[in-house]
């Protein structure tokens, strides 16, 4: 459960990322594919060359979904219900991949935000991404 301090930290990090969240999402997805090549299996239809337009576009989709989640931290299941259905029933993404992408997003944000990515912000964002992952995999039964 996210505390009030966690929610404030997550909102602060997301605001600092500002208009770059789409770019950071693409970079995090790139980092995931490079670090964990098995994650590429879900994207046979995409150009997975590092920095490709396909990766950047999907990374922006990820970032947009996270922006939605940041705005609905008190009701993540409601806000992410359609995405949960998509990932569980249609795409059938292995739940471990959400953890891998979350890790790569944390690394990406740390690289870009520097001193603004404090240990407290890191911990709060990690909890937030874990909560998002839990919601996205909640229908995997």
UniProtKB/Swiss-Prot annotation:
Record's keyword annotation contains Manganese: no
Residues binding O2: 58
UniProt keyword annotation of Lipid biosynthesis present: no
Keyword terms, alphabetized: Acetylation, Heme, Iron, Metal-binding, Oxygen transport, Phosphoprotein, Transport
SUPFAM superfamilies for this protein: Globin-like (SSF46458)
Self-association and partners: Heterotetramer of two alpha chains and two beta chains. Two external cysteine residues at beta-16 and beta-52 cause reversible polymerization to octamers and most likely irreversible formation of higher polymers.
Described purpose of this protein according to its UniProt entry: Involved in oxygen transport from the lung to the various peripheral tissues.
Name of this protein: Hemoglobin subunit alpha
């Amino acid at each position: 459960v996210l505390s009030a301090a966690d929610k404030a930290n997550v909102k602060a990090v997301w605001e600092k990322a500002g208009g770059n969240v789409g770019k950071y999402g693409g970079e995090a997805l790139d980092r995931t594919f490079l670090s964990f090549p098995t994650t590429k299996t879900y994207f046979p239809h995409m150009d997975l060359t590092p920095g490709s337009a396909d990766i950047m576009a999907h990374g922006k989709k990820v970032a947009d979904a996270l922006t939605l989640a940041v705005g609905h931290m008190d009701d993540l299941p409601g806000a992410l219900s359609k995405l949960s259905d998509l990932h569980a029933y249609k795409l059938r993404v292995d739940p471990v991949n959400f953890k891998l992408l979350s890790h790569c997003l944390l690394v990406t944000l740390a690289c870009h935000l520097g001193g603004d990515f404090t240990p407290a912000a890191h911990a709060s964002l990690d909890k937030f991404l874990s909560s998002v992952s839990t919601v996205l995999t909640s229908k995997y039964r």
